[in-house]
Every structure is written in C-alpha cells, then in structure tokens.
A protein has these predicted regions:
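Extended, well-ordered alpha-helical scaffold/bundle regions in very large, multi-domain proteins
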Residues: 180-220
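Short glycine/serine/threonine-biased micro-segments
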Residues: 6-8, 197
C-alpha cells in the first residue's frame, strides 16, 4: 500500500446503493507500445486517459466526510484504505472493519476475505478481480480496467462491505465480544497504520532477550 496509487473511490450508504468515483483510470496502451505515461492526474488530456474527475478536487470534497468524527466509516481491511488516503493527507475516522469483526467473532473457523464472507454470510458471489482485470499474462492493474467494469466491481465491494457490517456488528453484543473488539482490535487499526508508515526501531539485543523469554514461557 505504500506504493499503491489511488485509482478511484467506491462508496455505499445503504444496502443496494453504491457508487464508484474513478480518479486515475487509463486506457490500455496500444499493442506493442510501452506505456510510460503519467499517473492519471491530467484530467483527461492524455489520449490514453478517459475523462474523469480530478483527484485533488474529489479528495477535497470527500475529506470533510471521511474525517467527520460523527460519521462512522466502514471498510473491509480498512487499514489498507487508510494507508493510501494518508498519502494524500486525508484521514478516515472513526472506522469499523468488517474483516476484523469477522476475525473477532469467528477466528479460525474460516477465511475472512470479502469474497468468502459475502458468499458465506450473504449468499452472494462477488465479481472476482480476475473477471475484470484478467488473469496470468493478460492481467492488468486496476487503472487499466474499463470504467464500466471497474464500476461494477468496486461498487459491489462497497455494497457487500456495508451489508456484512449490518450482519456482523450486532453480533458483538450477542456473542459477548464487544469488549474485545472495542478495546483491543479496533483501536489497534490506526496504531498499525502509523507503525507501517513510520516504521519502528528495535534494539537487536533486547529483541533477542524477549524472544528467549517468550520461548521459555511457551515451553512451560
């Protein structure tokens, strides 16, 4: 995520209602041509760039909402989204994460990817990334996915994430896991983002001592 570019933003505010805002999509370069074009910020002036809203303009409009403390933002592995948006000086707070919710409620029972959870809990088979971006040697990065296909894929992701949240969040109290999520797992999300962004310094000697201590405890 430290190198990923923001290609677009998908949003959903109610089940079945979602949108996708393309920001940096590009058309596939001519066959045999080596495309060393820009990052999609030219607002449609490049012949290989479809017309779309300027990224800075879009983020300026979205920033107040994404940083509004009175509006809960829900994502699946939202740490990834947070890391990318932070590079554009946009924060996301407060947040809920459906991947973390699933892990807290059903750790070890199954995978916690969006596709698997959508099928398992909602009975819905998501569009696969390979269906829109291709597979093998024909796979392209998301910026080269045609806008109509990108819309279907990205908007569905936002829709399914919100639907999963409606299923998972109420279970915290029912399964007596609210304290674990609210006091341990959710507060850890911004901490991990900060650690991955800034890095951490470790004293090798102290780390070795801790490793030895933990090994002894496990042996007991």
């Amino acid at each position: 995520s430290m190198r990923a570019e923001l290609v677009g933003v998908s949003l959903s505010y109610d089940a079945g209602k979602a949108c996708y805002i393309p920001l940096a999509h590009r058309m596939v370069a001519p066959q045999g041509a080596l495309d060393l074009g820009g990052d999609g910020d030219d607002g449609g002036t490049d012949q290989n760039t479809p017309e779309q809203i300027d990224r800075d303009t879009a983020l300026a409009l979205l920033k107040p909402l994404l940083e509004d403390p009175s509006v809960l933002k829900v994502g699946h592995n939202i740490k990834y989204d947070t890391e990318i948006l932070a590079r554009y000086d946009v924060g996301i707070t407060p947040v809920d994460d459906t991947m973390v919710l699933s892990y807290v409620l059903e750790a070890g029972q199954h995978g916690h990817g969006l596709d698997e959870l959508s099928l398992r809990m909602l009975g819905h088979a998501n569009i696969k990334f390979g269906d829109v971006a291709g597979v093998g040697k024909k796979r392209v990065t998301f910026e080269y996915v045609p806008l109509d296909r990108a819309l279907d894929y990205a908007a569905e992701d936002a829709d399914m994430t919100l639907r999963l949240h409606d299923v998972l969040k109420p279970r915290l109290a029912r399964d007596h896991m609210a304290t674990v999520y609210e006091t341990l797992e959710r507060p850890l999300i911004p901490v991990l983002v900060a650690m991955e962004s800034a890095g951490i310094k470790v004293a090798p000697g102290h780390l070795k001592t801790l490793s030895t201590d933990f090994t002894k405890r496990l042996d007991k």
